Design a protein with these regions (language model features):
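Basic polycationic patches enriched in arginine
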Residues: 3, 29-32, 326
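N-terminal low-complexity, Ser/Thr/acidic repeat segments characteristic of secreted
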Residues: 7-9, 23, 36, 40-43
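Signal peptide processing junction and immediate N-terminal pro/mature segment
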Residues: 18-33
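Sec-dependent N-terminal signal peptides
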Residues: 1-22
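Long, low-hydrophobicity ectodomains and other hydrophilic envelope-associated domains
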Residues: 38-330
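N-terminal compositionally biased, intrinsically disordered segments and leader/signal-like regions
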Residues: 15, 32, 37-38, 318
Length: 330
């Protein structure tokens, strides 16, 4: 790890000094004592790009990012530049370790990343899911709309439950005399005993299916498919999971795992710096969330991300995840 980054981690833990990057190209950085009177000044850049800023007075960390996509199934809210833009809404030119250090400097409490397996004996792993933990981090997004008007929203408003996937509802059998239409296509899976539907069900489509039968169980299954397939804003909150380190076998240097791009995730990754406090698959076909396209400004729009550690203890307050996607039976 670079010497300046090690210094930054030390600063974050001790709180004695801050690393100040000059805005003038070519000028050297300097580390100096920071009097309390100066901590209420402008946010302090923590990296040479000036994209990560420590705002002690506002008790927040600021990230200068930009929109990289608006129509994706998501693994993350924000990735590092030139890493995972194909499955993220925002991207930032920064090091994940700098973001980690900035959160520590604000006093944020690091938790533990998600765990999918545990080792019960040398070389033997068994499934053992543990969700990510850590201090809750409130995330807000600031940008200017096409009229130049400043906007600010909670980050959850840009993420919704995935809709372009299959939904299912248990049903032992079709009511007598019911023949499902081919258009719109509602499928009864005889083997798994469930109704299956793809995508967002429109009210008119729901009404077509409800007219097929007065059977209460069938109508309940249709209602469930309709409800679960509607675009629904993400409700889960983010926590400071903290990623981890590995030692490069060739260089013998420590490497921060989130430098692979997993900065602010909505799918659980052991390498995530920030992750959501609920089970959320990291497998492509089972991803739970997608971009809320109607709410996101155009690609390349500059967005200021606010990371605000919450003072209240982190409890098991995240709602259960939405139903897991599944494919049609063969």
């Amino acid at each position: 790890m670079n010497r300046w980054l090690m210094c930054l981690f030390g600063v974050a833990v001790t709180g004695v000094a801050v690393v100040v990057w000059s805005a003038e190209p070519g000028q050297p950085r300097e580390t100096r004592k920071s009097p309390a009177t100066k901590r209420a000044a402008k946010p302090v850049p923590l990296n040479p790009q000036g994209t990560v800023l420590l705002d002690r007075a506002g008790k927040r960390l600021l990230l200068k990012a930009s929109v990289c996509a608006r129509d994706r199934v998501l693994e993350m809210l924000c990735c590092l530049k030139r890493t995972k833009e194909h499955e993220s809404i925002l991207t930032i030119d920064a090091s994940a370790a700098v973001v980690h250090a900035g959160l520590l400097a604000l006093g944020a409490r690091q938790g533990t990343p998600v765990r999918h397996y545990k080792e019960v004996s040398p070389g033997k792993l068994v499934a053992d899911f543990k969700p990510p933990t850590g201090q809750q981090i409130e995330i807000y997004l600031q940008w200017k709309d096409k009229k130049g008007i400043p906007r600010r929203v909670r980050a959850q408003q840009w993420v919704r439950r995935a809709t372009q996937r299959y939904f299912s509802a248990p049903l032992a059998k079709l009511p007598d005399g019911v023949v499902l239409p081919k258009e719109p296509e509602l499928v009864f899976d005889v083997k798994n005993k469930e109704l299956v539907w793809f995508g967002t069900m429109k009210p008119a489509q729901r009404d077509i299916f409800l007219k097929l039968s007065k059977d209460a169980v069938f109508r309940k299954a249709v209602g469930r498919l309709f409800g679960e397939s509607q675009p629904t804003e993400m409700r889960a909150h983010w926590v400071f999971a903290g990623s981890g380190f590995i030692v490069d076998m060739q260089t013998k240097k420590k490497k921060y795992l989130a430098e692979n791009g997993n900065l602010i995730c909505v799918a659980n990754f052991p390498s995530a710096t920030l992750d959501i406090a609920q089970a959320s698959s990291d497998k492509g076909s089972n991803l739970l969330y997608e971009a809320f396209i109607d709410r996101i400004p155009p690609v390349n729009t500059e967005v200021l991300i606010e990371l605000i550690p919450k003072s209240r203890p982190v409890g098991k307050t995240s709602p259960p995840p939405p139903a897991k996607p599944r494919g049609l039976p063969r």
